[in-house]
């Protein structure tokens, strides 16, 4: 006959309080049917175990609910974008994302541009755009305390002009943009930059046609004051789409710029959106084009650089960093391969300049390149001796 396990004597009870999990395990092994409640700490074991189980179950329940919420959100977003194309339009323009947030665009000197004038133009009724005119650095002393009239008059002096068209998000006062203005100004260029309607302190609702018209208005304003001085157009990121739209229109009316510079360009907005890092989690989602790309096209947004370059008749320079995480390098290279053999560019120089990924210039830091000055001198001509 099996011997019944003896109860733990009270005087030895303290030795049984070693880790509770081990005690419970030993008791389970020694217990005989019918002895439930015989051990003094059985209720403690059951209580602790239930609490531990409850905590684990509660954690798993919350995690499961969170995962279900994420899955529901993941599935719902494509339908929201399809039903409300304005969401996708905002993702393209990002004009409401303004950074730096606390700068006064009326005071470019706060950004270190003490030879810059701020003013406003009105391309259309109910549309106003904020503009900065930065004169060549050699004129910075003369520019101190001068008014808009002086800045307009100095455009006719013997210095070339660059019209800069920025990308989405931010304003004309964005740091990487300001740093580029300084580089170009130090090389002897006037730099005209502005915020499209709906960006910064400019008034109006953004659209591709509206942005292009704003750029055309500023270009005509420059040409009316710059005399025979060269006028170049520089577009960056989304601004390359505005730039090719503008230059195509200028070429069609036979008033092309002296050169076009595209920094970090894409082929067209559909290919760019499909390659954008934001699209990674949906790129293989069934019906991706229908959900995400068709609403962009339906909103009248194309920015068809690949088509526009076939109708451009002026020298073309493309700059692109291999480590660009926003607009993949291969899109800039593809655009060059389309432009180089184009009939309209047959008599003009078309150049593609890559920047190695080890340099770390990514999407918006090509201005840091020590070679940029020489690249521009070789392509546009030297201005620093003037």
Curated annotation (Swiss-Prot):
Biological process annotations from GO: acylglycerol catabolic process; monoacylglycerol catabolic process; phosphatidylserine catabolic process; phospholipid catabolic process
GO MF annotation: an example: lysophospholipase activity
Subcellular location: Endoplasmic reticulum membrane
UniProt KW Membrane keyword: yes
Cytoplasmic face residues: 1-66
Top-level taxon: Eukaryota
Pfam families: Abhydrolase_1
Extracellular topological segments: 88-386
Primary localisation category: endoplasmic reticulum
Family annotation (InterPro entries): AB_hydrolase_1, AB_hydrolase_fold
Keyword Metal-binding: no
GO cellular-component term (any): endoplasmic reticulum membrane
EC numbers, comma separated: 3.1.-.-, 3.1.1.23
Active-site residues, record numbering mapped to chain: 237, 324, 363
SUPFAM superfamilies tied to this protein: alpha/beta-Hydrolases (SSF53474)
Keywords associated with the record: Endoplasmic reticulum, Glycoprotein, Hydrolase, Lipid metabolism, Membrane, Transmembrane, Transmembrane helix
Membrane topology recorded in Swiss-Prot or TrEMBL: Single-pass membrane protein
Glycan-modified residues: 114
Reactions mediated catalytically: 1-(9Z-octadecenoyl)-sn-glycero-3-phospho-L-serine + H2O = sn-glycero-3-phospho-L-serine + (9Z)-octadecenoate + H(+); 1-(9Z-octadecenoyl)-sn-glycero-3-phospho-(1'-sn-glycerol) + H2O = sn-glycero-3-phospho-(1'-sn-glycerol) + (9Z)-octadecenoate + H(+); 1-(9Z-octadecenoyl)-sn-glycero-3-phospho-(1D-myo-inositol) + H2O = sn-glycero-3-phospho-1D-myo-inositol + (9Z)-octadecenoate + H(+); 1-(9Z-octadecenoyl)-sn-glycero-3-phosphoethanolamine + H2O = sn-glycero-3-phosphoethanolamine + (9Z)-octadecenoate + H(+)
Residue intervals passing through the bilayer: 67-87
Function of the molecule: Lysophosphatidylserine (LPS) lipase that mediates the hydrolysis of lysophosphatidylserine, a class of signaling lipids that regulates immunological and neurological processes. Represents a major lysophosphatidylserine lipase in the brain, thereby playing a key role in the central nervous system. Also able to hydrolyze oxidized phosphatidylserine; oxidized phosphatidylserine is produced in response to severe inflammatory stress and constitutes a proapoptotic 'eat me' signal.
Family that this chain belongs to: Belongs to the serine esterase family.
Protein name: Lysophosphatidylserine lipase ABHD12
Source organism of this protein record: Xenopus tropicalis
Gene: abhd12
């Amino acid at each position: 006959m099996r011997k019944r396990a003896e109860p733990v004597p009270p005087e030895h009870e303290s030795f049984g309080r070693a880790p509770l999990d081990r005690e419970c395990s030993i008791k389970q092994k020694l217990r005989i049917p019918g002895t439930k409640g015989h051990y003094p700490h059985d209720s403690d074991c059951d209580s602790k175990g239930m609490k531990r189980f409850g905590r684990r179950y509660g954690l798993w329940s919350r995690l499961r609910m969170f995962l279900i919420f994420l899955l529901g959100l993941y599935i719902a977003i494509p339908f929201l974008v399809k039903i409300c194309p304005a969401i996708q339009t905002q993702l393209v323009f990002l004009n409401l994302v303004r950074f730096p947030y606390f700068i006064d665009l009326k005071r470019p000197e706060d950004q270190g541009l003490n030879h810059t004038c701020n003013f406003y133009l009105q391309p259309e009724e109910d549309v106003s755009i904020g503009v900065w005119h930065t004169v060549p650095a050699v004129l910075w002393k003369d520019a101190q305390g001068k008014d808009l009239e002086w800045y307009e008059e100095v455009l006719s002096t013997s210095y070339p002009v660059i019209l800069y068209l920025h990308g989405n998000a931010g304003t004309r006062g964005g740091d990487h943009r300001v740093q580029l203005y300084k580089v170009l100004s130090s090389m002897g260029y006037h730099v005209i930059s502005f915020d499209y309607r709906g960006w910064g302190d400019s008034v109006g609702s953004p659209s591709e046609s509206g942005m292009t018209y704003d750029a055309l208005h500023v270009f005509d304003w420059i040409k009316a004051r710059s005399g025979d001085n060269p006028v170049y157009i520089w577009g960056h990121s989304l601004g390359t789409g505005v730039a090719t739209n503008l230059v195509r229109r200028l070429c069609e009316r036979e008033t092309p710029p002296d050169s076009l510079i595209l920094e970090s360009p894409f082929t067209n907005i559909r290919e760019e959106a499909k390659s954008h890092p934001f699209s990674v989690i949906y790129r293989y989602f069934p019906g991706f084009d229908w959900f995400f790309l068709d609403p962009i096209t339906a909103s009248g947004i194309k920015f068809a650089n690949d088509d526009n370059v076939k109708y451009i008749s002026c020298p073309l320079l493309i700059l692109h960093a291999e480590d660009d995480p926003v607009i993949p390098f291969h899109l800039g290279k593809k655009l060059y391969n389309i432009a180089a053999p184009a009939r309209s560019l047959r008599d003009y120089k078309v150049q593609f300049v890559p920047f190695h990924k080890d340099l770390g210039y990514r999407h918006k830091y090509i201005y840091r390149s020590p070679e940029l000055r020489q690249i521009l001198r070789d392509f546009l001509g030297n201005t620093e001796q003037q």
